[in-house]
Amino acid sequence: MNYESALEYIHAVQWAGHKPGLSRTRTLLAALGDPHKKLRFVHVAGTNGKGSTAAMLASCLQAAGYRVGLYTSPFINRFNERIQVNGEQIPDDALVRLVERVRPAADAMADVPTEFEIITALGMLWFAEEKCDIVVLEVGLGGTLDSTNVIDPPECSVITALGMDHVKELGPTIADIAAAKAGIIKPGSPVVSYGGVPKADAVIARVAKEQNAPLTVVDFSRLKVEGGDLDAVTFDFDGLDGVRLPLIGSYQPKNAALAITALRVLRSRGWNIPDSAIRTGLEQVSWPGRFELLRHSPAFLLDGSHNAHGVRATVQSLRDRFPGQKFVFLLSIMADKDVDEMLALLLPLAKQFVTVAAHTPRAMPAETLAEHIRARGGKAEAAADIPAGVARAVELGGDGPVCALGTLYFSGDVRQAFARLTAE
C-alpha cells in the first residue's frame, strides 16, 4: 500500500455516509488495543469556531511544553492536516502503516465503520504512538453520537458558539442542537461554554448539573478588543493584556477568550500552563482558511464560513477590516444549508458574485446558486470550475477586495488556483 492507495481506502465508497452511534468506533478501537485509553483529552464541540479554538488550545499547550495532539476536520490542503502532533502533520509513511493496521480490523466488522470513524481510529493510534501528553479533539458532528465521544471523561470539555446548523441530523431547534453538543459533557469533568444563547445555555447547564460537571461560562465582559488590522487583532482578557492574535476575524478574540478560560481550568486541575505560554501560543497560532488573507493589496480573502451563523460573523469582520468597501464574492454553498439567509447577509456588501461548485456531492450547482442570487436582485455569474471562478473573481475585483467563502471544502482548491494565477 502506498499513500494514494491508503487515502483511497479511507475515502472508499463503502464507508460513505453519516451513521451516528458509538458502537462501531468502540469495536474498531477495541480490535486495535484501545489506544484512546492511554490518552488525555480536551474535547471541543460547537457550531462555529471549533477549529480555531482547538488550534489555539493546542498552540498554547505546546508553548507550555506539552506534547500535543490535534484532531480536526475537514482538511484544507492535505488530508494529513487532520492529525497533527506539535503542529506537525502525520507523515505519509506513518499514515500508510496505520491504515494497513486498521484495515483488517475494519474489514472484519459486520457493521462497516464510516470514513470519519476510520480516521478517528487512525488519529488515536498516532497520538498514542507519539506519546502525546494531551490531545485536543474536535468533534466531527454534534457530540452525543459522534465517534470522538468514545473517550473517557476528558480533562475539560469545551463548547464553542452555537447556532442553527446540521438540523437534519441534530434537530430543528437550538435546544436540540445544544443537547447534542452537551453530549460530550462527562461525569465530574469540567466544561467551559461560550454561552450567549439562553435556550442553549439552559440545556448545557442542566446536563452539566446532571453529570456533576463543573461549568464555567466565558465572561466576555472581561474582553476588550484594542484594535485590528490585516495582520493581527489586539485584545485584553482577564489579566492578559495586549495579546496580538494573528487570526484577524473580528470574532476570533471571543474564541481566544474561550480558549484562555479553558486553559485556566486545566491549570486549576494541575496542568502547568503559565499566562506567558498562553500569550506565546495565541501569538503564534496558525489556522488556514478562516478569514485568511492570501493577498493584502488588492485584498484576496479566504474564509470557511459555511452556515448563516458563520457568515454573519464573517460579514461583521469584513465591515470592520474593510469599512465602506464592496466585495466580489467567490461563492460555493452546500445544498443543505440555509442559502437564502446566507445570501441576505452577503448581498449588502456585494459588488458581484461568481459562483462555483466545490468538489463534493453536497455542493449546490454553480448555476443554481447564481439563480438564487439573481432572484434576490444580485449580480451573479456561474463559473465552470474553481480555477475559472478564481480568475473571474480577481478580474471583476480589479483594485477592490475579493472574498472566497461558503464552505471549507473548496478552500484548498481556491488557494492552489490563486497561487497559480498570481504566479503567472
Where are the regions that the model predicts?
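Charged, amphipathic alpha-helical linker segments immediately N-terminal to NTP-binding catalytic cores
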Residues: 1-16
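ATP-dependent carboxylate-amine ligase catalytic core
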Residues: 18, 22, 26-38, 63-152, ...
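Nucleotide phosphate-binding/pyrophosphate-handling subdomain across enzymes
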Residues: 38, 134-137, 145-158, 162-163, ...
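A conserved segment at the C-terminal end of the G1
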Residues: 44, 52-69
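Acidic, Mg2+-coordinating active-site environments of NTP-dependent enzymes
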Residues: 110, 118, 131-138, 154-239, ...
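C-terminal helical cap/extension that packs against the catalytic core
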Residues: 194-216, 230-234, 299-302, 308, ...
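Active-site-proximal loop/hinge segments that shape catalytic or ion-binding/gating pockets
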Residues: 407
